[in-house]
UniProtKB/Swiss-Prot annotation:
Mn(2+) 2 binds at D282, H287, H335. It comes from Clostridium kluyveri (strain ATCC 8527 / DSM 555 / NBRC 12016 / NCIMB 10680 / K1). Belongs to the phosphopentomutase family. Its main location: cytoplasm. Its EC number is 5.4.2.7. SUPFAM superfamilies: Alkaline phosphatase-like, DeoB insert domain-like. GO terms for cellular component: cytosol. Pfam families: Metalloenzyme. Binds 2 manganese ions. This is Phosphopentomutase. One of its GO terms (biological process) is nucleotide metabolic process. It catalyses: 2-deoxy-alpha-D-ribose 1-phosphate = 2-deoxy-D-ribose 5-phosphate; alpha-D-ribose 1-phosphate = D-ribose 5-phosphate.
């Protein structure tokens, strides 16, 4: 029985899609532009896997004899957010994008929310969660008004001090928002963000809770779970799929912790899917236009990939990909509409195969089900036949 380890390098796109102009993303090339700005990236394992051999990539080193197969996927869904990218990867193509609110939420949404929770709100803008609680934390404590904010993703986030608005009450507020934000107002996730005051600043607690949406159809994860195999989720995967199709999940502190948790599941689990998201690239560096920090994070992650490879069994398959772009070298702090890389490695697979330019992220999910010999009606065109010996 094969086991697949699927790792999403969140936001590590590799070049603008043909429709990038519609999204204001002409010129975006997250990995290529970071490499150019850094004067080259020391990511030897990704090069060995073939990332520099993908058609059309720029500023990346080619490998004469890559140990992996390589290619890239376009996004069929409308949008460029986390949920849309991950859902398509698992076989769900969205014809209508989930709503994002780069200018904050419209007055009618905020007014309705305020009436329903019986309080005014603070914020209502795009913000970093750690920064906005320190910007507005004192005012929140003084007034009792919760802090509402969003991000480049389709999210409605509500932050409150645990002693001002108890956690259960905050959860009730988020349930109200979840019921409101459907139909033409749909957002992918409503997130409760409790915090406290500690050592001179406001810090988030572990009582975060996501009120997500079920994917609108059967996903790769559902198919795997239905046949009795494990689906182990690392990072925010559990939240993206609203816990559906997942047998066990663990949240993480950062990229390195995410790799540690992935290795832990590899030692514990012997079949099915281990599905990890490494979010630091996007959250800490992409949105903050921190090109140098992004480059360092890529180098750090690359150094850990050999650990994953050395812990793989004979039949294991490793797939490294992304979910969208977030080019820190552009003026925008938003996600970018880009191709995503697909790197595939397994001891029993062919090496050096160019799987080409794929039409949809869903080809990844389709291929995983083929590798696990699971019959399915998932959207996408699998490439198992190209990489199988």
């Amino acid at each position: 029985m094969e086991r697949v380890i699927l790792i999403v390098f969140d936001s590590v796109g590799i070049g603008e899609l043909p429709d990038a102009k519609e999204y204001g993303d002409v010129g975006s090339n997250t990995l290529g532009n970071i490499s150019k700005a850094a004067g080259g990236l020391e990511i030897p394992t990704l090069y060995k896997l073939g990332i520099g051999n993908i058609q059309g990539v720029e500023n990346l080193r080619r490998c004469e004899k890559p140990i992996g197969s390589f290619g890239k996927c376009a996004e069929l869904s409308k949008g460029k957010d986390t949920v849309t990218g991950h859902w398509e990867m698992a076989g769900i193509v969205l014809k209508t994008p989930l709503n994002t609110y780069p200018q904050g939420f419209p007055e009618d949404i905020i007014e309705e929310f305020q009436v329903k929770i019986g309080r005014k709100v603070l914020g209502n803008k795009v913000a970093s969660g750690t920064e906005i609680i320190n910007e507005l934390g004192k005012e929140h404590v003084d007034t009792g008004y919760p802090i509402v904010y969003t991000s480049a993703d389709s999210v409605f986030q509500v932050a409150a001090h645990e002693k001002i608005i108890p956690v259960e009450e905050l959860y009730k507020m988020c349930k109200i928002a979840r019921e409101m934000l459907l139909g033409d107002r749909t957002v992918g996730r409503v997130i409760a963000r409790p915090f406290i005051y500690d050592k001179g600043k406001y810090v988030r607690t572990s009582n975060r809770k996501d009120f997500a949406l079920d994917p609108p159809g059967k996903t790769m994860l559902d198919y795997i779970k239905e046949v009795g195999l494990d689906v182990m989720a690392v990072g925010k995967i559990e939240d993206i799929y609203n816990k559906r199709g997942i047998t066990e999940a663990v949240h993480i502190k950062n990229n390195m912790d995410g790799i540690d948790k992935t290795l832990g599941y590899m030692k514990k689990n012997k079949s099915g899917l281990i599905f990890a998201n490494l979010v630091d690239f996007d959250m800490l560096y992409g949105h903050r236009n921190d090109t140098e920090g992004y480059a360092k994070a890529l180098v750090e992650a690359d150094k850990r990939i050999p650990e994953i490879i050395s812990n793989m069994n004979e039949e294991d398959v490793l797939i490294i990909t992304a979910d969208h772009g977030c080019d820190p070298t552009t003026k925008s702090t938003d996600h970018s509409r880009e191709y995503i890389p697909v790197l595939v490695y397994g001891k029993n697979l062919k090496a050096g195969v160019d799987i080409g330019i794929r039409k949809s992220y869903s080809d990844i999910g389709k291929t995983i089900l083929e590798l696990l010999d699971i019959k399915n009606n998932l959207q996408g065109i699998g490439f198992k036949d190209l990489i199988n010996k």
